[in-house]
Regions:
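Active-site microenvironment of metallo-dependent hydrolases
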Residues: 1-269
Length: 269
């Protein structure tokens, strides 16, 4: 009821959230209540999916204005970290598996190059407005050897990159830009997997089965390059949302959400 009846009542969505005469027949049929494996999905009384496969024909139209929305500035030489001041420590975004909250770590500059658990995170303004690029550090993605890219980055949906190699980060950025937006995994100069999202850089125009297959390939590729997160692109998508504690990054730089201030990468001791 917490996921069905209660929300429907809270938002006064009459006819939703329950199984009774007069209610819309939006139903799930599950194998059992422990594993909660979904076998059938009904929408308005019609069978919509069986064992994870969507059954309805899919058609859709979208305006030309939501195409060609990725306009990147020059990247060369702009995805490196600023040089640290003497005796400075770096503000590092620490992510947690399956959570959108982050922690702010302070790591001495001398320890950064020696750590294989840190990666660069960059936000690149992609709407052709100001050409901003901000670069920081992130911990929690695992021991990456390559780069991840995504144009899904709440709420401004700029391009976000996480990686350990500058050339791989640039290639990942070019890959999603050429597709009109999307997700990509790159390592050692090769694109291992990608999913084009040409509708505003946020949505695919492919059928659900194709999107599901490509999304699974992305996750497998991310694991192959050392990513330890179960949902890396979901985690990435919230790193640029500067309203959730503690530390975020936008195209204007790092944001200390507890103070609602833009802060430098390097903090003096």
């Amino acid at each position: 009821q917490m996921a069905t009846l209660h929300p429907a009542r809270h938002y006064n969505l009459r006819g939703l959230g329950g199984i009774a005469p007069g209610y819309q027949a939006d139903l799930l049929v599950v194998s059992d209540l422990s594993s909660f494996r979904i076998e059938l999905v009904f929408k308005a009384g019609k069978l919509a999916a069986r064992e994870g496969r969507y059954l309805w024909a899919q058609t859709g139209k979208y305006a030309k204005s939501v195409s060609n929305t990725v306009h990147l500035p020059e990247l060369q030489g702009r995805l490196s970290l600023e040089k640290p001041a003497q005796n400075a420590g770096a503000r590092v975004i620490e992510v947690q598996p399956e959570q959108i909250l982050t922690k702010c770590l302070i790591i001495p500059a001398a320890e950064i190059d020696a750590s294989d658990e840190l990666a660069r995170v960059a936000v690149v303004e992609r709407h052709g407005k100001n050409g901003n690029i901000a670069v920081g550090l992130v911990k929690g993605f695992g021991r990456l050897k390559g780069a991840l890219a995504s144009t899904v980055a709440h709420d401004s949906h700029n391009l976000i990159l996480v990686g350990t190699d500058t050339q791989d980060m640039e290639l990942a950025a070019r890959t999603v830009a050429a597709a009109g937006g999307g997700l990509a995994v790159v390592s050692e100069g090769r694109v291992l997997a990608s999913l084009a999202l040409p509708v505003a850089g946020l949505m695919s125009n492919e059928d659900a089965d194709t999107v599901s297959r490509l999304h699974e390939e992305l996750h497998r590729a991310a694991q192959r390059i050392g990513c330890s997160l179960p949902s890396p692109f979901m985690t990435m998508s919230f790193l640029a949302l500067p309203v959730i504690p503690e530390l975020r990054i936008t195209d204007f730089g790092l944001v200390d959400v507890t103070k609602f201030e833009i802060v430098d990468l390097w903090k003096q001791k």
